[in-house]
Amino acid sequence: MNRGFGLAIGAGCVLVIAVIAVLVFTFLWIPFRVVRETAVEAPATNRPVIQTVGTALPPAPTFTPAPPSASTANTASTGTNGANGPALVTTSNLLAGRYEQLSPGVVNINVLVESAEGSGQGAGSGFILDREGHIVTNNHVVAGATDIVVNFANGLQAEAEVLGVDDDSDLAVIKVEQMPESAHPLPLGDSDLIQVGDWAIAIGNPFGLGGSMTLGIISALGRTIPSGVAQFSIPQAIQTDAAINPGNSGGPLLNLDGEVIGVNAQIRTGGANANTGVGFAIPVNVVRHVVPSLIANGSFQWPYLGIGGTDLNLLIAKANNLDIQQGAYITSVEADGPAGAAGLRGAPSLSQPTVGGDVATQVDGQPIATFDDLLNYIAFKNPGDQITLTVLRNGQPQQIAVTLGSRPDLDVQSP
């Protein structure tokens, strides 16, 4: 064979092999490179969006929702979102049905306030309690109002009068003489049955935008919050991340069964005049406790113990030679109050308030872990009721019976 010809054939073979190698490399490498860039280079900020689109909300608790309208039902039956679509559509349909069912029971409230400085306007929310025209709202919504106008979901309006208010719970009842036929009461639930993580719905009038609905969860339970207009606190408040803004005050916080579980009252803003994900509602069991008296008498009498205190903690326990860390440590006792009359003791020295006070560990046989536990238990009693406190005094257990009084009008906060 000619040497030149052989070299040419060899070079040609090398060229062919090189071309084949390039083609194989191209077809194998390019798809791998694209997949790798998609997985590695995609910005992290995109991931929540992808999860929101592709992940269904957790299923709602089992119950039979109110039948939605035909248009809502048609939307649910035709919606498609892949494998997770039915769950998303079902949840969306449930919420749409709940709004249609519940919104006629929610009202917007506009008030006119006259003062020495002039007149002003305010707005809030409320919900219908019964067919007699009683509406529950916040005291701070209607306090000082000279005129109150209730706006119903169908657009009709009616004037209202204040029947009763309670500063300490920030609750009020107003009444209209006539309601539209479409308006209806909202059922009351049981705030003792709700749990952290339960879904929560708020419907109201934020920033004057009536008929607004927001969704969140129960973030915490058993909060004690200031009433905002009185020196006493509201017990067992519900914390939620459902958006609550100015104008939502007095509106209902509801569960997915369509029951009122609270009355929206406050937000923790951190200085901003808007929702920051921390809202508070007065529990519906406080509503059950207070509102009947507001309707019948125009006011409510809260029980009163007459003590000051704090949670027992490690440092207080150590200072008092106690081997427990839970209880209500009593720092002060009002001498002529119910606790003083019964013989409860606070710290004997103002210079050492964490030494020598009684430590309440039980009330009527129920354990007390914090000072709020004691206050919350008393809050659902009535003046004249008798309670039995188990206390540690100098490390020794004692049982002390106390007859509760009525809250006085104080200048400073006292439990």
List where the protein language model places each region.
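Serine-dependent protease modules
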Residues: 26-326, 331-335, 363, 371-375, ...
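N-terminal Sec-pathway targeting helices
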Residues: 1-16
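Short, exposed coil/turn segments at beta-strand boundaries within extracellular/luminal domains
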Residues: 394-397
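Hydrophobic alpha-helical transmembrane signal-anchor segments
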Residues: 14-25
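Conserved PDZ fold ligand-binding element
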Residues: 135-136, 341-372
